[in-house]
Amino acid sequence: MYCPKKGSFIMKKHAISLRSSTVILMRGLPGSGKSTWLRNNNCEDYVISPDTFQLMLSPPIETTRDGEFTYEINQNVSRRAWELTHECLRSRLSCKVGNAVGATFIDATFMSDRAVRDIKRIVLEETQGRAIVVILDFTYLPIEEVKRRNKMRRGTYRYVPECVIDHMVELGAQMDVNSYGVRVLDPREVQITV
């Protein structure tokens, strides 16, 4: 990254190659900047997103929350969206046609133990240890900032009720991300390479 004030390049502490056999879990609350980080780092072609599958399976649903009309992602298709996420991950990890290689980013909150363990299990089953799992942890962002950003989404299907965010915070606080045996990185210290 170029630093104009100093006229030099700043080296990030960690590099992730888009050609590596790496599965990167984008962990963080809704509105913490996961999708923006992926877009800003030109990683969108390497992303699997359960939210995208939910929108493919069902249009947003109309609802009234706190007396206000709004749209939400249909949570009734969440299970199927995660099944498709797992199927796509298995396909990417097992694809040998044309000597395919490449990183895979999974854009979800990963604020539950099960979601992380499921992905880790799939990676191990499909690659027998040839691929690694990394967590890019966006939980450094203060909850007040997450809620401020979320309020800016009000009226769109990307808005998440604050009670849901609070519940995710509680779930995430129970997790010890260092117990999964994977690298946990601060996204501000990661550089993407080709």
Regions found by a protein language model. Give the residues of each.
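Conserved substrate/cofactor phosphate-moiety recognition/catalytic segment
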Residues: 36-102, 145-147
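ATP-binding Walker
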Residues: 32
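ATP-dependent NMP and nucleoside kinases share a basic, alpha-helical "lid"
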Residues: 56-61, 65, 110-158
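Short amphipathic alpha-helical segments and helix-helix/interface helices
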Residues: 38-39, 89-90, 120, 124, ...
